[in-house]
């Protein structure tokens, strides 16, 4: 499928994450080629999964998700839903957020961010996912 050996290695690392399929791994490789060469906050911001807080002086608005690469954010949504069901550490994180009273969409966005930051760390360290990673 992938002719270049370094791309095949990156593809194998991404598909080792439970919930991330082949198509999502390809989208990550295409839309975010710098993944693995930055810190976690920058990766989340580039994917559009870092909250932006609206505030000015004493006035405080709400935080929201905006900016970044929309196609990447759209591509990671369904794998986040799959990971909530089949990836035990991410399911535990989702359940903890919901038990704390957070809305479902916020918890899903947190899982999306966790997937991106985990993928970034795995590609940076050049190793596959293990259950203790998340």
Residue positions per predicted region:
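A detector of single, family-specific signature residues
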Residues: 1-134
């Amino acid at each position: 499928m992938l002719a270049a050996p370094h791309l095949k290695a990156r593809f194998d690392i991404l598909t080792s994450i439970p919930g991330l399929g082949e198509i999502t791994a390809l989208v990550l490789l295409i839309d975010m080629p710098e993944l693995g060469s930055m810190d976690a906050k920058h990766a989340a911001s580039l994917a559009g999964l870092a909250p932006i807080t609206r505030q000015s002086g004493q006035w405080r608005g709400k935080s929201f998700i905006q900016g970044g690469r929309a196609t990447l954010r759209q591509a990671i949504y369904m794998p986040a839903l799959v990971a909530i069901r089949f990836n035990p550490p991410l399911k535990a994180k989702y359940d903890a957020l919901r038990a704390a009273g957070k809305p479902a969409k916020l918890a899903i966005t947190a899982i999306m961010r966790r997937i991106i930051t985990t993928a970034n760390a795995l590609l940076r360290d050049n190793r596959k996912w293990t259950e203790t990673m998340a």
